[in-house]
């Protein structure tokens, strides 16, 4: 933890995309981008590569979940939302994603 009591999460990337970031002050979660263009047909799913690796401290977890706007406008959801990212030494982030329309 840092001096403010915040858990320190480390990201490493193999992509030119920016690291995950909070779009607005007060956002509960960070936005993450796909590292590839993917077309998901209606009622099908795909695993999307983010090009990111993450280290979460022991005893904590990260969560991946759908953005409400993306889900409402396009029917795109994280398949097992919220998806748990366990505290292991080094995890490659991929998103199992489904198109529900």
Per-range role (PLM):
Residues 92, 97-101:
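Single conserved hydrophobic/aromatic residue that forms the stacking wall/gate
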Residues 1-93:
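DUTPase catalytic domain/fold
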């Amino acid at each position: 933890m840092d001096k403010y009591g915040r858990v320190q999460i480390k990201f490493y990337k193999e992509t030119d995309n920016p690291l995950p970031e909070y779009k607005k002050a007060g956002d509960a979660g960070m936005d993450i981008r796909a590292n590839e263009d993917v077309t998901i047909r209606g009622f099908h799913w795909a695993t999307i590569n983010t090009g990111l690796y993450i280290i979460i401290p022991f005893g904590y977890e990260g969560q991946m979940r759908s953005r409400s706007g993306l889900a409402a406008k396009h029917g795109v959801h994280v398949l097992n939302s919220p998806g748990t990212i366990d505290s292991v030494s080094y995890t490659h982030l991929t998103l199992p994603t489904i198109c529900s329309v």
